[in-house]
């Protein structure tokens, strides 16, 4: 993943990607997938929820159907994405790095990342951070894309994105000390036979 292997290049990519994000994101991820992520996070009206790599707020909207917006905290590395999200929702949007989350240990009941891990330079570190800030017994849920079936799309996508296998996601969760690990593979959707893996684990 040469384009995003360091923070500076990653930030530059995100800044330009934000211009087309709202057009590209729905092509990769359906509402059904986002709802499944939120369902697996076991959120209720009293939950304090963190979304990592929240983008412009697509998954945040699904979270807000279950818990008040003031109980949702969202972190994204791109100021342009945060600005758009703030126009959509009244959740707590914070500019920050998935691999160095600006929160104390054991802060949140549930921690979610949907459609962001594929752009992280170090996904294992990001999942460790998600586990760190989640309360004992809380859920960590990550949605990750599968490699595109079309060879032309795949060749382009592999230059800017990571496509972790289900086994790789489970290994990252184990490394982060998570237990009760589960996963769901979803598809077909648009151009893909199997599009995503949604992995969850309990702290």
Regions found by a protein language model. Name each.
Residues 110-122:
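A short SAM/SAH-binding and catalytic strip from SAM-dependent methyltransferases
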Residues 138-144:
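Conserved beta-strand signature within the Rossmann-like core of class I S-adenosyl-L-methionine
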Residues 162-177:
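Short alpha-helix
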Residues 185-203:
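Core SAM-dependent methyltransferase catalytic element
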Residues 99-110:
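A short acidic, Gly/Pro-enriched loop at the edge of an enzyme's catalytic core
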Residues 50-100:
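Class I SAM-dependent methyltransferase SAM/SAH-binding core
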Residues 124-136:
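A short glycine-rich, Lys/Arg-flanked "PGG" loop and its adjoining helix->strand segment in the class I
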Residues 1-42, 58-62, 81-84, 148-149:
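Conserved class I S-adenosyl-L-methionine
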């Amino acid at each position: 993943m040469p384009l995003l292997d360091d923070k500076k290049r990653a930030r530059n990519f995100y800044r330009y990607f934000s211009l087309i994000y709202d057009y590209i994101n729905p092509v990769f991820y359906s509402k059904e997938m986002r709802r499944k992520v939120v369902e697996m996070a076991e959120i209720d009206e009293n939950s304090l929820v963190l979304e990592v790599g929240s983008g412009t707020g697509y998954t945040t909207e699904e979270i807000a159907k279950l818990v008040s917006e003031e109980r949702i905290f969202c972190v994204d590395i791109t100021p342009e994405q945060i600005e758009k999200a703030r126009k959509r929702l009244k959740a707590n949007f914070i500019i920050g790095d998935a691999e160095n989350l600006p929160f104390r240990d054991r802060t949140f009941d549930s921690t979610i990342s949907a459609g962001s891990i594929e752009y992280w330079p170090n996904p294992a570190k990001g999942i460790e951070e998600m586990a760190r800030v989640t309360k004992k017994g809380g859920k960590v849920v990550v949605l990750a894309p599968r490699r595109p079936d079309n060879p032309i799309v795949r060749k382009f996508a592999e230059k800017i994105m990571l496509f972790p296998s289900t086994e790789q996601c489970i290994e990252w969760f184990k490394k982060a000390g998570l237990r009760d690990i589960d996963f769901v593979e979803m598809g077909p959707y648009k151009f893909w036979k199997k599009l995503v893996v949604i992995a969850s684990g309990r702290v």
